[in-house]
């Protein structure tokens, strides 16, 4: 029952907001922040900036988003507002996760963590785990849980693409 009340209050806030900025504007701005700061190549400075930028964008979203239409009935803009609100939280959490993982591995390259030859530098001694983040309200308050990865049939080793 409490969850239903929270969702209804959130939807009513979107409709009654009287903001002046379309949902799509926030969606595009979030995409730009993620593309520029949390892509395949990333660094501590850009990730830290992205977290601050997304947090500010999220605050602006709730203050200024315009959602036309009614609360009940077909309203694709209301649906979109809910999705973008979720994406703002997810984007901030993705940046937080990328900032916490101080290694280069797989498809993501931390510029601070590379070999002398410019290859991705793994840190298997510290990062052989799956990250699972527990929601605690705000993305900045999410709690990291680590699930250890155990390899039985392969050997972990530094890759080289040369």
Regions found by a protein language model. Give the residues of each.
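Glycine- and aromatic-enriched mobile tails/lids
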Residues: 1-162
């Amino acid at each position: 029952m409490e969850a239903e009340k929270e969702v209804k209050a959130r939807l009513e806030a979107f409709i009654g907001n009287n903001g002046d900025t379309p949902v799509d504007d926030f969606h595009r701005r979030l995409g730009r922040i993620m593309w520029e700061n949390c892509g395949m190549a990333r660094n501590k400075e850009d990730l830290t900036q992205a977290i601050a930028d997304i947090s500010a964008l999220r605050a602006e979203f709730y203050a200024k988003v315009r959602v036309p239409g009614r609360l009940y009935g077909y309203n694709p803009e209301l649906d979109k507002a809910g999705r973008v609100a979720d994406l703002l939280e997810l984007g901030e959490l993705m940046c937080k996760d990328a900032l916490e993982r101080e290694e280069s591995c797989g498809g993501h390259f931390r510029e601070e963590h590379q070999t002398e030859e410019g290859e991705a530098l793994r840190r298997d001694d510290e990062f052989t785990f799956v990250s699972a983040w527990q929601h605690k309200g705000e993305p900045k308050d999410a709690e990291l849980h680590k699930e250890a990865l155990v390899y039985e049939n392969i050997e972990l080793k530094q890759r080289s693409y040369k």
